[in-house]
Amino acid sequence: MKTKPRVFFYSKSLAAKVMGLSLMTAAFLFSCDKSNDDLTTSPDQSSQKEEVRKGQLNGQSITYIKKDGLNFFQGDIVLSDKQLEEGAAASKGGASYSRWPGGKIYYTVAGNMGSINANKITSAVNEYNSKTNTQWIPRTTQSNYVEFIFGSSSGSDGWAHIGYQGGKQTISLDQYISVGSVIHEMGHTVGLYHEHCRKDRDQYLSIQWGNIQNGQAYNFNIYSSGTDIGPFNINSVMMYWPNSYSKNGLPTIKRANNTTFTYNRTGFTTGDINTINAMYP
């Protein structure tokens, strides 16, 4: 598999062939990783005023956070105002909606990123360019692009706009974020949502609602307006950490048989790669 783009929804016949993630109609992102995606608080949301809001995304009612002028969905996915404005409409469902044209994603890296995180970005870009059909290309004068910005000097989180929105988009990375979590955030950029929000997740996962922090349960809601490609993949780089948003240190997500699992922030699984390549054939 070489570099070629893809993003969002595909036909059920293709989905049956592909191993993979959860893709969802429209474009929005989220990312998590607090020293291993430990989402005890929303990415960089603990010290800033935030407002819980209700909205519509592809015809589905959702809960999101308004903070610093950004709309955070599922913790680390940033929705544009336009996406929310259009949200009451029926799901787009089209394969080209929110997909980067030709699978080409132009990017820049903020000057204050630092060499360590810059190297992590390079490693993550190499993973995408060598294993998926997307092409991450250094920007010259392109008007539609992504900028990697430096988030916090003490955290290990990140966030990103989801899918192709046009104009300048952002991927924010904290100082101690891992390469795997950079890949996770970039996954939102290409159009991937979180694996635990798939429509079929209850066949494979048991959400431990009693262990979730007060006011954070909405981050575990199923996003039924999305399109799932391939079988559920608990090892996906887009899965939440088992203790995400835990209020007591106990798991908030277990397997359906009530056993724990080890989450992946090492890199792509075969299912992740197949899903992205289904989006960007």
Predicted regions located by residue number:
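Bacterial Sec-dependent N-terminal signal peptides
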Residues: 1-8, 15-16, 20-54
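A residue-level detector for conformationally permissive "hinge/kink" positions
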Residues: 12-14, 183
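Zinc-dependent metalloendopeptidases
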Residues: 33-281
